C-alpha cells in the first residue's frame, strides 16, 4: 500500500474513533483484528480489503449507531472470507457482536435465479432477530454498489436491479433516507446510464439559478415573518436526488424541463405547535397549491416519518415545496430505524422490537418455500403507497393503497378476517372488494358462519390477508379430503365385511403409511383408488371391470387407476388433444397431439398410440413463457395475476438483457380453459409483449 493510502486509512479510522470516545479502544482493537485477518486480500478495485469494512463502519457512525454495530461492521466479512470462527469473535468482542456478524454472514452472498428468493428470506428473518443486521447489510450494499464499475455490464445491471428492487425499498421502509437515496442514485447510474447523465446535467445547470432564487426571494421573506412571531428555526434547502427526479418524469409523463421543484425548503423548529404556526405563515405569504398539502405529523408514515409537506406558488410564479418538522422528527427522518436502536450498555437489542410491517413481512414469508411467493410477498410489502383509515373507535390503521375491507379485517385479527361477512364505510354498506380511501371510517361486520373464499384472493392487496386466506382454504381442503377418505374407507370396510381395526391392520401389511390420517388423505385425494387398495389387500379378489373392446380411445377420469406418465416435452393438460403411447416400463405416456416427439412413433408403431380423453380432476403442470419490457415490479405483477387466477407457481426463471425480460414459469392449472384465462390476464399486464405456452 502506498504511503498516501495508509494516511487515508488512518484519517478514516481517526474519524470513526472520534464518534465513540468512550469505546475507542474496543473499536481500534476490532479494526486491527480485521486488518490482520484480511491480510493481503484486495477488493476488485485493487484496494486493500480493509477499506470496505471501514467504509461500512463510517456510514453507520454517521447514522449514530451504537459501538457494537460499528465493531460488527469492521468484522462483518471475517467469518466468511477469513479463518475466523464465531467463538473467536465471541471471546474477543462479546456474544452480541458475534451474533451480529453471524447474522450478516447468514444472509450470504446474494445469488440469482432459484436461490435469490431464499437469500431475501434469510435477510428478513435475520433482520427480525436483530434489526441492526439490516442496517449493516444496507451499509455493506451501499459501499459495494459504488464499485460496480469493475464488473462486466451484465453483472453490473443485475446487482443494480436488485439494489433498486429490494435494498432501496427496504431502506425506504426503514426510514433511512440517506442510504435509500444513495442506493437509488447509484443503481440508477448503472441501470440507465444515459438517463442518469441527462438528469445530472439538468440538475447541475438548474441548481445555481434556483439557489439564487430561494436565497433572494423566498428564504428572507419567510425568515423575517418567523422572527416577527418569535419562532427560532433553521431554514435550509436541499436538492432532490437524481432518481426521484427521473421517476417523477416517468410517473407524470413530463419532460425534465417541466420539473420545477428540484430544490425544496426545509424548516426545522422546536415544537409541534410551531410546525403548524409556520405552515400558517407560509400559506399567508404564498398561495398554496390545492391537493399538495400532506400532514405526516398527525398521520405518520409506517416507518414513523413525520413532517408537514406543502407546495406553494411563490414569487415569479415558481413552485416551491416546504417541509416543516421538529428537530426530533428531523433526526428520525434522516436516520429512520437507526434512531430507535441506539442501544445502551447491557440492553438486549430484541427489546426494541421491530415495526409492525416488518413483523407482518416475517410472518408472511416464514413458512413459505415457493421462491415466487417469497418474492411476491417481499415486493408487495416494500412497494406501496399508504392509505389511512379509521376504525369506529377512532384507531388509525395504515394499509397499502388499493386495500379492501378484507385486508383491514385481517390487519385487525386473523379471526376477524376469517369471519368477515361485510363492511360499512362512513356508515354505508360497501362490498368486500371496495377500495378503501384515506379518511374512511370502516366497520367490519363479522358472522361466525362466514368463511374465506377463493374469490377473495382476486381482490385482496396485502400479503398478510392473502396468506391467511390461503392457510384457511388449505386447511378446509385438507378437512374435505379427510372426510372423503373416511367415506371411501368405510365403503371398503362394508364391502369386505371387516371391522375398522382389521381393515387398517390388513392395509398396514400391504401399504406403507405413517398414520391413518395419511391413508385417509391419499384416498380422499384419489392418490390411491379403492379398487387398487382392495387388490393390494386381496390380490385374488378382483373387481369386475368393464372392458372397452373395439375402441382406440382411453378415458382417464382417475389417473391413479392406470400406470401413466405425462411427457415432459409437452406436458398435456385436460382440454388438449392428447395421444397416449403404450410403453413397457412407463405405462401410458401422454403427449399433446402436435408434439414433435410423436412423429416417429406414429410412423413406425401406430398401433401403440391411443387417443386419450383426459377427464381427471385436480391440477396439472404446464410451462409458459412471458416476454416483456423490464421494469421495477414486473415479476411481482405477473406472479400476482397467476396467484389471483387460482394457480400455483411451481418454479420460475427470469433472464434480463438490454431492457427485455424473459420469464419462464411452471404453473399448476385445472385444464386448458384455466390456462388460457391466466395467459389472457398476463397479456394485460403493463409491458408484456408475449405470453405463450412453452414446449420443450
Curated annotation (Swiss-Prot):
Q: Which PROSITE patterns match?
A: ACT, HD, TGS
Ordered alphabetically, the record's keywords are: Hydrolase, Manganese
The record's catalysed reaction(s) read: guanosine 3',5'-bis(diphosphate) + H2O = GDP + diphosphate + H(+)
All copies of domain HD, residue ranges: 49-145
For activity, the cofactor(s) needed are:
Mn(2+)
Q: Looking at the record's lineage, which domain of life comes first?
A: Bacteria
Which family is it part of?
Belongs to the RelA/SpoT family.
Described purpose of this protein according to its UniProt entry: In eubacteria ppGpp (guanosine 3'-diphosphate 5'-diphosphate) is a mediator of the stringent response that coordinates a variety of cellular activities in response to changes in nutritional abundance. This enzyme catalyzes the degradation of ppGpp into GDP. It may also be capable of catalyzing the synthesis of ppGpp.
Please report the name of this protein according to its UniProt entry: Guanosine-3',5'-bis(diphosphate) 3'-pyrophosphohydrolase
Species annotation: Aquifex aeolicus (strain VF5)
